[in-house]
Swiss-Prot record:
Swiss-Prot/TrEMBL keywords: Cytoplasm, Protein biosynthesis
Pfam name, any one: RRF
Subcellular localization(s) per the UniProt record: Cytoplasm
PANTHER family: MITOCHONDRIAL RIBOSOME RECYCLING FACTOR PSEUDO 1, RIBOSOME RECYCLING FACTOR
Primary site of residence: cytoplasm
Name this polypeptide is given: Ribosome-recycling factor
Superkingdom assignment: Bacteria
UniProt cross-references to HAMAP family, sorted A to Z: RRF (MF_00040)
Family the entry assigns: Belongs to the RRF family.
Gene Ontology MF term list: ribosomal large subunit binding
Annotated GO biological process: cytoplasmic translational termination
Length: 187
C-alpha cells in the first residue's frame, strides 16, 4: 500500500538532485585535462548584461590539453577574452581572429592533492544532503504510522525502501568521487 502522503519517488528525485549538484561542482574542478565544462562558470559582460560564455561562443576540446573557444560575434572577442582572464582559472587565451585557444597547464602534485580534498568536501556535502532527505522521509513515515494512516508493516517496508534509495544515492556519489579523483591524480 503506497500512502498518498508519502512519495518515495519524490525522495529519490531529491536524492538524485544532490548527486546532480555534486556532478556539476566536480565538473568545475580543473584536472589538468581540457574539458568544456571548465568554462561553465565564466560570465561575460556582453550587450549590457552578464551572460554565460556558452551563450556567446562554442567551446570545444581539439586536444587533451587545449580548449578552443569560437566566438560567434566578432565584437565580443575582447569581452570573452577578458572574462576568461578575470575568471581566476589560470588560463591565458591566445586569440586568432574569432577563435581563442587556451592551453591547459600541467598541475603539480600539491595542487592535485588540494583538488582531491576539495572533491571530497563536495562529495561529503552531497552525502549529508542525501542523509537529510532520508531523515525527512523516515520522519514522515513515522508520523504516518503514529497517526495510524499506515500500518507498522507498511512503516517497516517504507523504511527499507528509503534506506535502499539512500544506499543507491550514496553509492552513486562515491562512484562520481572515485572517477573524479582518478581523473585528477592521472598525470
Amino acid at each position: 500500500m503506497q500512502s498518498e502522503k508519502f512519495d518515495i519517488n519524490d525522495l529519490k528525485r531529491r536524492m538524485q538532485g544532490a548527486s546532480q549538484a555534486l556532478q556539476h561542482e566536480l565538473g568545475g574542478l580543473r584536472t589538468g585535462r581540457a574539458a568544456a565544462s571548465m568554462l561553465e562558470p565564466v560570465q561575460v559582460d556582453a550587450y549590457g548584461t552578464h551572460m554565460p560564455l556558452n551563450q556567446l561562443a562554442t567551446v570545444t576540446v581539439p586536444e587533451p590539453r587545449l580548449l578552443s573557444v569560437q566566438v560567434w560575434d566578432k565584437s565580443m572577442v575582447r569581452a570573452v577574452e577578458k572574462a576568461i582572464v578575470d575568471s581566476n582559472l589560470g588560463l591565458s587565451p591566445a586569440t586568432e581572429g574569432q577563435v581563442l585557444r587556451l592551453r591547459i597547464p600541467e598541475l603539480n602534485q600539491d595542487r592535485r592533492k588540494e583538488l582531491v580534498k576539495v572533491a571530497h568536501k563536495y562529495a561529503e556535502a552531497a552525502r549529508v544532503a542525501v542523509r537529510h532527505v532520508r531523515r525527512d522521509g523516515l520522519d514522515t513515515i513515522k508520523k504516518l504510522e503514529k497517526s495510524h494512516e499506515i500500518s507498522e508493516d507498511d512503516q517497516k517496508r517504507l523504511d527499507q525502501e528509503v534506506q535502499k534509495a539512500t544506499d543507491s544515492a550514496i553509492s552513486e556519489i562515491d562512484q562520481l568521487l572515485a572517477s573524479k579523483e582518478k581523473e585528477i591524480l592521472t598525470v
